[in-house]
Design a protein with these regions (language model features):
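Conserved G/P- and acidic residue-centered "switch" motifs that form tight phosphate/ATP-binding loops
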Residues: 24
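Catalytic-core regions of hydrolytic enzymes
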Residues: 108
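Short, surface-exposed alpha-helical segments at coil->helix boundaries
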Residues: 27, 31, 52-59
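ATP/NTP-dependent adenylation/nucleotidyl-transfer catalytic domains that generate, transfer
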Residues: 2-19, 32-42, 49-50, 61-82, ...
Length: 250
């Protein structure tokens, strides 16, 4: 992965990378692999009414990276006021759709911030999504954390992310923390939102073509969850649809 990133930067004549660091395992691994390229790396913390534990893990990880890799620098951009101002600007609504829209807006504010520093330094944004999120259940925000230039770990299953994180001696607090997208005002984690663990979703990805009679009741339940997410979020994984105009119409 490190060599792939270096080769991409070389071919693109780009001199550095920008990564958003959240305190989660995916961004911790991605930022570590980017740091290992030896190229300039800006790690950006972007708290939005964030839990103190997430902020603490993020800071510890960035401090660890900077102590180990001289090519790493960091920025702390507190987006609390920006987000709160946005919330006040849109109509009040008590629906779930309103809360979900605001959650996704947090992710999109972070994308805007990452690309500000990317353009400022003529760097590129490295995404932090793994294979289960990006190509299994589409568990990310379109034009939010899905808005990136390269995806170094998007071919790694979540279990492989954990294995590599341990190999690279990433902070155990990060490894042991329950995965969360950090987009809500409560303590819900990814499993709460999905209805299954990443280990279960991985199994479902491999069970997708098996006969249901070969599966346990829980496996059937998780497979149904997987298929539902995969179907409803498939638009995130495909190119933007283009209306093709027949030449004889022009």
């Amino acid at each position: 992965i490190v060599n792939w990133i270096k080769e991409y930067l070389k071919n693109s004549q780009i001199n550095g990378l920008v990564v958003g660091v959240s305190g989660g395992i995916d961004s911790a691994l991605t930022s570590t692999l980017c740091a290992e390229t030896g190229k300039k790396l800006i790690c950006i913390e972007m708290p939005i009414n964030q839990g103190k534990d997430q902020v603490s893990r993020s800071k510890k990880h960035i401090d660890w990276l900077k102590s180990k890799y001289p090519n790493v620098s960091s920025k702390l951009i507190d987006l609390d006021n920006t987000f709160d101002s946005f919330v006040k600007s849109v109509p009040e609504n008590n629906s779930y759709e309103h809360e979900l829209s605001l959650a996704n807006s947090r992710s999109r504010l972070r994308m805007v911030t990452l690309y500000y520093f990317s353009a400022l330094n003529k760097y590129i944004v490295a995404g932090t999504g793994n294979k289960v999120e990006d190509f299994g259940i589409g568990f990310y925000t379109k034009y939010g954390d899905g808005g990136v230039d390269i995806s170094p770990i998007a071919d790694l299953l979540k279990s492989e992310v954990y294995s590599l994180a341990k190999f690279h001696n990433i902070n155990e607090e990060i490894i042991n923390a329950k995965p969360t997208d950090g987009l809500w005002n409560d303590n819900r984690n990814d499993e709460d939102q999905i209805g299954a663990s990443y280990d279960e979703i991985e199994i479902a990805m491999f069970n997708d073509h098996k006969s249901e009679r070969d599966l346990s009741e829980r496996d059937k339940e998780v497979l149904k969850i997987y298929k539902s997410f995969n179907s409803s979020n498939r638009h995130k994984m495909l190119p933007i649809p283009v209306c093709k105009i027949p030449k004889d119409y022009i």
